Amino acid sequence: MKKHIVELIMGCLLLICFYYLSREAAAVSVEMNQKQVIVVDCGHGGMDPGMIGIDGLKEKDVNLAIGLKVKSALEKKDFQVVMTRETDVGLYDEDSNNKKVQDMQKRIFLIQEVKPVLAVSIHQNSYEDSGVKGPQVFYYRDSVKGEELAEIIQEKMNDYLEVERPRQAKG
């Protein structure tokens, strides 16, 4: 039950984040007068379950459920959304010697090929220290705008959740 509440909170947080992201991207879209593309990457999938909770809940399933909701919310805001996956599949060939590496390479290639205004990768992190709580936003360290946006999102999520020991955005 507690795990599902955490999932619900994380889903709500992502929707809040996308609200702020969509406002920024909408301003750019108006200037360019065209539909902006956002890539939503639902982490893990296929043979890679990601973290597995005490109750057997797999990170890949949570990521996909959140990603599909994010896609729907963004499309309602008139964005074109490209998903790395919309079902429980990995982005690797079955005969690949290193499925994890190939999966990551294909995700990167997709983002480079699409050239989105924004790419978001959804994951659920776990930590050995049970005192560590709250969301953490990651950004491409060489992107000044990405860092600024990540810090805004991090601050909004920490405020919304009233996190006692808030994390910092990380590049």
Give the positions of each predicted feature:
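Active-site-proximal helix/loop segments of hydrolytic enzymes
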Residues: 2-9, 19-33, 64-171
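Bacterial N-terminal signal peptides
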Residues: 12-16
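Short glycine-rich His-centered loop
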Residues: 36-56
